[in-house]
Amino acid sequence: MSVFVIAEIKLSNDSWVSDYGANVHPIVEKHGGKYLTLSRNVTVLEGEDRGNTLIGILQFPDAASVVAFASDPDYAPYGKARQAGGINSFQMIDDTDIVGTISYHAAA
């Protein structure tokens, strides 16, 4: 079952972003993943504004692929640069529908 990673970042230093973008996409792809979006155009519609200045959504075939990506030694220097350049939150969700009302999703 597909899983999604939601990366929320509040940038304090964006000097790492270009290098990260140029090098991390192939590492994501190596683990079967792909970026669905990566944007600095963040608008809070409801709830607390946490000051996120960059949000990315990635899709992977399964949770094991996310773990393999995150622990890949090739990714380590880019992950460290990202962590040093802002406040980060990475969340993983699966592709279920907890109430069973979305016709194209698997019920939980």
Q: What do these predicted ranges mean?
A:
Residues 1-71, 94-108:
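Short S/T/G/P-rich N-terminal loop/turn motif that feeds into the first structured element of a domain
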Residues 76-91:
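C-terminal structural segments of small proteins and small subunits
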